[in-house]
Every structure is written in C-alpha cells, then in structure tokens.
From Swiss-Prot:
One of its GO terms (biological process) is protein import into chloroplast stroma. Phosphorylated by KOC1. It comes from Arabidopsis thaliana. Residues 862-869 are annotated as: G1. This is Translocase of chloroplast 159, chloroplastic.
Amino acid sequence: MDSKSVTPEPTNPFYASSGQSGKTYASVVAAAAAAAADKEDGGAVSSAKELDSSSEAVSGNSDKVGADDLSDSEKEKPNLVGDGKVSDEVDGSLKEDSTTPEATPKPEVVSGETIGVDDVSSLSPKPEAVSDGVGVVEENKKVKEDVEDIKDDGESKIENGSVDVDVKQASTDGESESKVKDVEEEDVGTKKDDEGESELGGKVDVDDKSDNVIEEEGVELTDKGDVIVNSSPVESVHVDVAKPGVVVVGDAEGSEELKINADAETLEVANKFDQIGDDDSGEFEPVSDKAIEEVEEKFTSESDSIADSSKLESVDTSAVEPEVVAAESGSEPKDVEKANGLEKGMTYAEVIKAASAVADNGTKEEESVLGGIVDDAEEGVKLNNKGDFVVDSSAIEAVNVDVAKPGVVVVGDVEVSEVLETDGNIPDVHNKFDPIGQGEGGEVELESDKATEEGGGKLVSEGDSMVDSSVVDSVDADINVAEPGVVVVGAAKEAVIKEDDKDDEVDKTISNIEEPDDLTAAYDGNFELAVKEISEAAKVEPDEPKVGVEVEELPVSESLKVGSVDAEEDSIPAAESQFEVRKVVEGDSAEEDENKLPVEDIVSSREFSFGGKEVDQEPSGEGVTRVDGSESEEETEEMIFGSSEAAKQFLAELEKASSGIEAHSDEANISNNMSDRIDGQIVTDSDEDVDTEDEGEEKMFDTAALAALLKAATGGGSSEGGNFTITSQDGTKLFSMDRPAGLSSSLRPLKPAAAPRANRSNIFSNSNVTMADETEINLSEEEKQKLEKLQSLRVKFLRLLQRLGHSAEDSIAAQVLYRLALLAGRQAGQLFSLDAAKKKAVESEAEGNEELIFSLNILVLGKAGVGKSATINSILGNQIASIDAFGLSTTSVREISGTVNGVKITFIDTPGLKSAAMDQSTNAKMLSSVKKVMKKCPPDIVLYVDRLDTQTRDLNNLPLLRTITASLGTSIWKNAIVTLTHAASAPPDGPSGTPLSYDVFVAQCSHIVQQSIGQAVGDLRLMNPSLMNPVSLVENHPLCRKNREGVKVLPNGQTWRSQLLLLCYSLKVLSETNSLLRPQEPLDHRKVFGFRVRSPPLPYLLSWLLQSRAHPKLPGDQGGDSVDSDIEIDDVSDSEQEDGEDDEYDQLPPFKPLRKTQLAKLSNEQRKAYFEEYDYRVKLLQKKQWREELKRMKEMKKNGKKLGESEFGYPGEEDDPENGAPAAVPVPLPDMVLPPSFDSDNSAYRYRYLEPTSQLLTRPVLDTHGWDHDCGYDGVNAEHSLALASRFPATATVQVTKDKKEFNIHLDSSVSAKHGENGSTMAGFDIQNVGKQLAYVVRGETKFKNLRKNKTTVGGSVTFLGENIATGVKLEDQIALGKRLVLVGSTGTMRSQGDSAYGANLEVRLREADFPIGQDQSSFGLSLVKWRGDLALGANLQSQVSVGRNSKIALRAGLNNKMSGQITVRTSSSDQLQIALTAILPIAMSIYKSIRPEATNDKYSMY
C-alpha cells in the first residue's frame, strides 16, 4: 500500500506509577531512529531485529541478515542484570529525540519527552525479577487519546465472523481502516472516563506490501501505520500460541510481574471485544467501538491485539492468571480468573522491540510481522489463525505456550496466578459455570460461587479478550491454558512456578497440554448429571477450528459456540444479559461446511433467559428454562463445559450416573433434571474434523473422557435405548449411532444431518424411563423365553463368525444382526443386548468349555458335471465324495457328513440332472428319491450348483428348473444359494472386443441363473434384486491361487469357502429365528418369497353366475314335452284366439313365382312390387306353420302322446327365444367363413365336411388373427346333446385351444329335470380359465312359474380356484309384458375368504310383433357390481335390425361409470356389395397415423 504520512501521537495504556521515571513512546522511536543512523555511520548498532521494508524482509528470508549484523546486534544489546535493569551501555542509543527517518517514507513521529537511559525498561529472563529502575521522566504528564466513537459496530468485528489465514491479508477494506487519533497530554493521575475499559475491535491486517516499514532497527510500522518498537533484545523465546485471539505481551518465561499502576489504568487488549458500558438502568451493555482513550496507535484490522505503549514501570510482575474472556452475547459465561494489573512495566513499543530483538538474536528468523502469514514457530512476533498479533516482550528460554483455544490472550507472565481486579461493576464469575442471580433491573446475572478478589477484567459482548489495566494482586489459582477463552498475561514458562506460589495444581507442562476434546453429550436416561458447579447434562463442543493455509474465515469467538442462533442479530445488550454467552456463528463462519447443525439441533438440559429466568414445567415434571432474548428468540439447548476442572467433575458425575447413581446439583436455581432425547441417535465426530494446527503436538481426544462418555452412553446403567450425542463444534459432519434396546454399542452411520430439527422438550420423566432390569422385569415369561432363545442364537452366530475369521461389521453379518435386532424389538433390555452377546461369545470361545450346538444340512442340486461333489470335498477339506472328470461319479442320492470348525455339516449329494426337455421324466424320477431323503433329513440350505463359464441367455435350463420346482415345491428356493463353480475362469470378450471385467462377468452370469429361477417359480417378482437368491462363487481346481494362509482365493481376492459358509450360517440362523418367533403360523408355500395369495376374481365369477341360461329339453324323438317356456304357452293361448287368421294364408289368391329371366324383364317398380308380395306370402306361411307347431305341442300336453315325430323334427335349443339371442337356423354346419386372404396357403378346403348324422358335432376353431394361414386352426370345438335315462336332457360343449405357449379348455355342461308343468331344475359343471389357473364351477338353479306370465329362478354356485373356494347365490325374475316386451331382473352375491361382491342386473327386451318369425329385436341392460368398496356401473345396448330384404345391421355398445366402453357395428348384406367399401376406413386411419403419429399421441403424453 502507498505510504502515508501519519503522525501518531503516542499514548500509553500502561501508566507508570507516580514517582517513577520513564520515557515517552516518541522518545523511544527517536532513539531507535538515531541508533539506525549511528549504525550507518559505523557507530551504534540496533539492539533489535532489523525489519526492512523490502520484500525480503516481508517474506521472512533469513538470508538477508548477515553475520556482521547479528554480531553487532548481539554486541549492542542492552545488558540485562539480575534485577531486570538495563545497563548503562544502552543509554547512548536511547537519549536523543528523533524524527522520521528519511530512508523510507514513514509516519511522522511526534517527539515527546526525552527518556533517560536508566528509565528504559527491560524484562529479565526470570519471571520474578523485573527491573525497578524504569521511571517516568515527567510525572506531571500523561498521554490521553481522544478517539472518536466508531459508529459502525461492524467495522470492529470480523466480517462473517472469521479470519482468513491462508491468504496474505491485504488491508484494502475501507471499513477496516482506522483513523489516527489526536493525542493530548494529561496528568499521570488522571483516570480514563470509561473505567479503564477501552476497546478497539479488529484484526491485524497484514499486508504483503511493506513500503512503509521503517528500516531502522527496533522501529517498525505496519501497513496501517502502527508502530512496533522492540525495546530489549533478550534470549530467544518460543511461544506457541496456536489459537485465535492470543496475545502475548511481556515475559513469556521470566518471573517478572508486569503490573499496572495503582491508578487502575487500562491495559488495552482489544481483540474484537466490545466495551461494556452503563446504560440508564445501571446495567451493562456492550458498546462496540467506544471512544478509546489514551491509545497511541490503533490497529485497524478486525482482530488486532492492541497494547498501548504507555509508560510501564519495571517491577516484579507475576504471571497474570489465565482469564476466561467472555464470549459473545448469547453464550455461557466463562470463569474470569481475575489477574492483577501490571504495576510497573515498559511501554508497549519497548515490549515489541524487545521481542523482535529476541527473535533476531536467538533464531535468526526474519519473519516480518508485515510479511503476510507468520509462522507459528517464529519467536518474538506471531500471528495466530485469527490474525491476532502476538509479540514476545522478553527473550527467555524456548517455551511452548500451547493456548489451544480461540479467544485466548496471553499478556505477561503465566507462571503465577494473579487475579485481575475490576471496578466491581461486573459480577464475579468463577470456573465458567455460575448460578443465575437477579440483577437490578430484573435481569439475569451470574453470581460467582467463589469470591474472587478484586476482579478487574470485564466481559464484552463480542466474545473478545480484554485485560483491565488496574492494579492486580498476586493470588494463587489454578491455571488451565488449554481451555477456551483463557487469557494469559505474562510469561508462560514450562515447569517454572513462582516461589511464593503455594498452589501445586498449576499446570507444569503448559507447552504440551493435552487438550481434552470437548464432547457434547445429551442423555435420555433417568439420572441427573451434575458437576460441582454445573447442574445439567450438557454439551461441550470441541473447540478445535481447523487451522492451516486452507482455512477460510473462522470466527474469532469460536471457542464456545452456543446461545443465539442468528449470527447476524446476536448483539444482546448487556442491560439484558449480565453474563456473556457465545453465539453460534453459522452461515457466515466456515461457509464451506454445508451440513451445519444449528443450535436447535443441540439438545441440552438447561436453557437460559436473558430477560428473566422463565421456567416452563413440562408434563414430565421437568423444568425447561427458555431463552427470551430481546433480539434472538431462538431457544438455545446447550450447556458448555469450558474449564478442565468442570470437565473432570463432569466425567466423574458421568461415571456415577452410568452406574445408576443419581447425581444432584448444588445449584439451587437450576436443579431440575433436563435430560432430553435425540431420537435414539448417538452423534460422534467425524474423523475429518481433526485440527491440523498444532502439528501433532497435542492429542485431539482425551481418551479417558471419551471412554467415560461412551461408557455412560452404551448401557452402563443407562435406561433402555439410552441415547448419546457427541457432536463437533460447528455441528458439521455428524454421525449417528442408533442403539435400540439390546444392541448397546452397535454403531450405524447415518448421512450428515443437513436440516435442523425442531426443538424438542422433555417428553420422558424419570418415572417413565426405566432401567434395563426394570424393563426385563416387565416382560412376560413367554417374551423372556423368546428373547433368551434369540440371544442364544445371536451368541451362536457371533461364535460362528469368530471361527470363520469374520467380524460383526462384515456386510452379511451386519445384516443378520440387524434383522435379529428388529425381530427382538425394543423391549429387549441390557440382558439381551448385542454387547452382552458379543461378550458371552468371546468368553465362550476363549474358554472352550461350552460346546457350540449348531449343525447344518445342505442339499446339493445341479446338472451333471458342474462340480457338486468337488464342492463338497472343498468345503469339508477331505476327499470324501468320489469325483470323475470323464463320467458320472454320483449315481444315487447319498449323505456325506463332516465337521468344519466344530460345526457338523451333512451334505445330501444328488446325481446330476439333465437340462434337455426330453429328459425331464428321468429327472422327475430322481427327484422323487431326493424327496424321500429330504423327509428323513430336512435340508436347511439348498445349493443349486452350476458353472460360471457356461451361462448363456437361451434359458436352456428352464425345463430343469421347472421340474425341480414341480417335484420339490416352490419352497425349495426359499433358502437356496446359487453356487457357480469354475469361478477362476477368464471372462469372455465383450461387445467391444476386449475381455469383460470380472465383476461384470459374474454379475451377468448370476442374473441369468436368478432370472431362470424366477421364471421357473412362475413369478417374475423374483427378478427383483431384493428377492433374488444369493450367489456364491466356488473354485475347486487344485491349482487355484492361494493367499499367504494357504486359502483358495478368487480373482477378486475373495476367500470363497468362508464366504459360502457364512451365507449358509446366516440363512440357517434367520430361518431358526423366524420359526422361533412365529411358531403358530403354518408354512404357506404360497407366501414364499413374499408371494401375494391371489384372491379369486369375485366380480367375474358373479357376472358368470347371474347369466340367464336355458334349461335343456328332451328331443322330440325321445318323447319329451319340452314345452316349458312361458312365452310358448302364451303363444299357444294366443293362437286359440287367432284361429281366424289361420285361413288368411289359405285365402290368398294363387301366386306363381317368376324365374330369374322373367324378373330381369320387369321394371324396377314391378320388381319391387313382386318382392313385397312374395315376402308377405312367405311371412304368412311361416306364421301358419308356427301356429300349427304350437297347437301340436298343446295337444301333446293334453294327450301325453307323441305326435308328429315322423313329419317334424324337434327344433333344438336354439329355437328357444327366451334368452334374447337370435334363434339359430337348424341346418347342418355350413362351410367355414371366407379366409382373410386368398393366397395358396389358406387351405380352407381341407376342412369341408358333410351333414352330420350323429348328435356329436365337432368342428375346428380358426384363429383369424394368426399369422399362419396353413395351420391357423389351433383348436377344436365339440357339442353333444343326449337324454340320460330318457328322462333328463343333457348338453355338453367343450372347446380346447393349444399352441406352443398356452393350453386353454372351456367346458359348459348342463342337465335338467322337470317338476310337473311349472317347474324345472338344472345342474351344471363348468371349467374355464381364470388367468393362468383353471376355475371349476358347480352350479344349480330351479325355475318355476308363479304367475301366468312370470317366471322366477333361484340358484347358486361353488367355484374352486386354486386353493380358494368361492360361493354365490342368485335370484332372477322374468316377466312378459305383452308379446313384445320382456323384463328380466337378477341379483346375487359371491363370497370368498371373507371378501364379498354384490351385483344386480336389469334387462329390457323389445321384439317385433311377428317374433320369432321376424328377427328384429333390441335389448338394453344395466349392471351394478360392488366389491371392496368400489361401485362399478355398466350399461349395454344390443340391437339387430333388418335393412331391406337381405341386409342386417347389428349394433352393440357398452359404457361403464369410468366413461370407458366400446361400440361394435356389424353389417351383413347379400344385395349391396358396395358395403365392402367401408374397409377403406381403417386403411385410411392407418395411413393417417403413419403420416402424423404425434396427432394421436398427444392425449396420451405423460407431459
């Protein structure tokens, strides 16, 4: 960036006490500049590392520092004496005032008062000794900075709550630009107006440009114009501050105590921390970007660590105790270990200069602060991953200060425990977990459990670290640097403790602190988790932000993420929250994590209210305190454990709770048990969330903590189905472990939780949650016995797994265990858990005392020569079954037994089957012998063996598979395993000419066999991958490749023997489990593979039942009076009244028919008149003949005699007009219809026949739609009528259709018996196809005449369809209204397997007056069927009309309630041949569809 002429007026946040001498910041800068000038003249040499403004200095190349410079630097370093004073040799280089050097453009330095040589303050290597010789030259003045209020709070916050570490941070944002503040001098005794709490938020914006870096030694300028002065070169210090928000000011190793004067002036450490001010109500509110007073320089980037360069006195300073800095508003409060201020010290510029000199002298690393990313290992000057500026003020021995949490600021010594005094406005907070008290305005505040002495630290709303500059007294307290939010002021030396420090619990290995991974635990058990200061089962989230060059925008205040959900609106005033809580930075922080778990996903047992504690009493009796913040109304569900002491107590309480001991809280205000559920899931951290910042120096998991948490979660005294949650800090990459009752620690990974779940209140109280033993007590004896047997099976299976060398995490084993868990249900307690089964299995196998009672019977089927016997030998490991490569080795069914891993296995070896269709009879005989052996030794597993290298898609094995299914039943495939031998065969070439991959080859061959089995069983649903039989590969060749253990392996690396045995064991265990839990259900072979039992089609059977049927009548030649038709009786009666019409035909004049030659001579009108007269005479003749027939039948009834046998033939059943169908002409069978084509292949002449002489009528059935004209006749139809015992007329009609695929048979047979003149009974037997099954129908009905023109029929039927039986009844009534109109109504019901169908029919028949002479008639019918709640309506119309003398039109139409139906029109004519032109219509439609196919497909389009 361009250099600016900035004139910072120096101020000091560290004020020297009155009476002390010191020098101003300007004097120090001037002295450094003069030293640089003297160096150029060969005089004085700078005592600090030279920070050049060149690119080399920025990049940190150490090559630029010559040996001469280093030696000169060492020579000119201030000599540090034991008391911490600076030797007089340095006086000369620091006395004179200096202006801005001219070498590079630098901000002008306002000259201040000169500082004496003896006033220069340096830090000694020991923490205890700090020079007392530093004083203030002018005691009557001090510097005060009037800083205008920063209006925009967002300028002091890190944008998006994160800091970019992986890129060089260029300060180009206008929002982060700070303004140089005016400086005016005031008396030293004056206090700041804001009680010493000044704050300047931001981050150190390190620019890779270094044009404005002062070249002189000891004086530096950042890209923002900040002046950095290294005041004393000391020994090298290695301060490993690896977390964001960490600032080390002062000694990192020595025992000096850097104190602030008694005037309680403020030490400014603004790390994105807002200042807390007072509002009108006397409560605290976070005031971001307050006017900062007495600040010499302002760091303008968004996460800067600011320390004023005010005058410090060199006095004994003890390490400021780590201060737990308050998080952002909306989070849990932290313990503030109040540290004493720095009574005496040095200016901040001197501190920086000394640290720079140390780094230069000890490590020779020229890693410039302005050079972008600063290495963590550099001594003296550092940047953490949040962009915080870390400076070592003293050169001491190499110390690794591992402050492993964000928001940690290290200022001064760490060795001793001092309490930072506050002005008393902030309530004391101890151990980060404090009870909730009542503030002045009714607001909630934290009351410290333990009295802290003179706390001076203040908490700000932004989650930043601020160190008060008030005077601090040395006290003893425990230091845990590894906790989040800890501020370390002073030096941090490993294993060095202050002499007067009486606390032995100080961490002595600060440099290598094992940071326990914060685990978030949510329980649904019946115990209450309580720590000494904590009264809840809470979530402690691991605060391990990913650090590295690839990390993007991690939030500074990310040490503890809890509280407010809204990251943008989380600025709750201090007036409403006197304790500070962190906010969950989601959305803006770590934007690359898409699967963040919001706050509402984090289940906790306690929730805080900012506007007053509001406890909602749940139905379970447990209180839930909800958050009612002013700006964020989201409920927080998390409790934070931040300190190591709290974590230890928490783990101890977990141990107690896990053993069933209820822990109670000592906090009176929040003593309710608030354990929540997370839906039976256990959430753990992903392995990918490992922090890479510390480079392996610290352990990510505290194994003891993790073990205790897991122990409490996985059944150690917890209630059934105990659930446990371990989550990462930001809720990303969660994995769930569902532990249903009885499964304990069974882990089941789920997909990352992406969507937030709604907040869940407590739904289970302690009274409803029972322990495992109580659950087991509540089980009935029968259930206990089932669970015990199930547990025994589980133990057996686990022992078998152990013997096979497989683990429970194996894919097949995991599926079996999962199914066992589902069958056990959630009622299983700890006694029947998976952990108990695993433990027992391991113990049983280790001891070897308990015998494994498990046996296996395996039936081996397959074609000849596929390797059945060789597979048996390979499994048993011995040459037991004889094998022959050139012939059949197995000629009969035999049993072969052996022991494998302690399991007795019995094989049923069978002879090879043949796949040819002609050999299936031989296969059936062999399979009958197999069936006999199966009755003696029922097989548990069936191995269908085939070769892998001979599979084709021609389905040649289908006849064989169908024979197996027919002989042994479909249940034979229930526990079948497809075993493919010769598995080491090379795959064939694929379509591209290259060999197929092995996996593709195996998959194709497996699918072929599975598909064949599905077709053989007869249900294509077996081709569903979830229902297919498992496939196992086998290679029996002695030269098969082996692994190191000598076990045969396949080309894919699989050990086939153990895999096949595992499949067998798994199917046997699952089969035993099913029979164990459901012994009452009989085996239904129809339900094998999930087959749905087909219910009979009741609507179809009902419609078949409701049809009207004519009763057979005796032929006239057998003396039967078949006059049982009401219509015929009516006609007989009517004929008596029409006797006068009998003479009408006789009264006609004679009529001479004309010949064709004569008709041709007639005109059209004459020809028409002739035909009308001819038709009229023919009709009169037919009427006369009909009446004579009726009279004869009437005489037959009266006389009981046989009349007219010789002169009249009996009109058959076809003449019965009551069915409404046109009467058939009683003529012999005519010639077949014209063929569809007139080619030579149509050999219709072959089927011509003469008039039959017997009652058996046989004719072929032509398939007019077939493609084969020569052999298009694929069926035969036979009809026969006879009289049984000369009394019972009977008819039978059978039609058989057979082709290559189907065989259909249709049979209608009836026999009737008369009951006097008014009644008749008929019985019938029908066979017809219903789908692929044959339905056998036995029916019967009785018809009787109750009125003159009314006839009633009552009937029923029984239908046998497979294993189903359907019964039905019907009622029918027929009434004749005159001679033309007939009404027919029928109703009935059909019932099968508790299912019923109801139906009704109504038909109206209309005939012409001369019926049956005239054939014109019409019928209209309505049908209604109700089945399974569905109502089906249908309408049918049939009409037959004569058009002209020789033309007829037949119309048939049907429509149902779903608006679907059909219309059929038939036209026949022997006069109008032009009617054949109508065939052009379908041809034209076909042509139109071929031209425009889209026109017809639009309405069927799915779019």
